[in-house]
């Protein structure tokens, strides 16, 4: 059995058919009432191109769903910032497995959080974006997944 290899590639260098295949898959996952025909028409790709690439194209974070991810965050040293981050993760059914917080230096605390993502109600990409927008969070980075 041949093992599939994966590459992490910036979306802007991919051919249009592959980018649009990813768009169709995202559209279908967000709007399950759509048919493939309707989705490919909305995105502007042929059905044959979609079917050619659909089994090999998926968002980067999709492969991490149902897995354990590790995030590195820089948090302002203020009361309640870490608590808000943890409550936010819990609100979307992320299961926090470990937390490691270093002593704050220069008003910033480095925090590492491992999260089980299987039951999460948002994508990992959406989680990262939302966390990065939170007051008191200056950096969020996905540093590992297993």
Swiss-Prot record:
PROSITE patterns xref list: ACT
| InterPro entries (UniProt xref) | ACT-like_dom_sf (IPR045865), ACT_dom (IPR002912), UPF0735_ACT_dom-cont (IPR008310)
Q: Which Gene3D superfamilies match?
A: 3.30.70.260
UniProt domain ACT: residue ranges: 70-145
Assigned protein family:
Belongs to the UPF0735 family.
What is the recorded name of this protein?
UPF0735 ACT domain-containing protein CHY_1913
Organism of this sequence: Carboxydothermus hydrogenoformans (strain ATCC BAA-161 / DSM 6008 / Z-2901)
């Amino acid at each position: 059995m041949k093992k599939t290899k994966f590459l992490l590639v910036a979306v802007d260098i991919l051919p249009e058919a592959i980018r649009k295949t990813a768009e169709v898959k995202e559209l279908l996952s967000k709007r399950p009432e759509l048919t493939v025909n309707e989705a490919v028409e909305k995105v502007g790709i042929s059905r044959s191109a979609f079917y050619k690439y659909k089994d090999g194209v998926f968002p980067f974070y999709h492969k991490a769903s149902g897995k354990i991810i590790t995030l590195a965050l820089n948090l302002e040293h203020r009361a309640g910032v870490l608590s808000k981050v943890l409550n936010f993760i819990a609100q979307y059914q992320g299961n926090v497995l470990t937390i490691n917080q270093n002593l704050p230096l220069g008003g910033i605390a480095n925090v590492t959080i491992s999260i089980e993502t299987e039951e999460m109600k948002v994508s990992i990409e959406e989680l990262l974006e939302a966390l990065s927008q939170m007051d008191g969070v200056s950096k969020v980075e996905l540093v590992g997944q297993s």
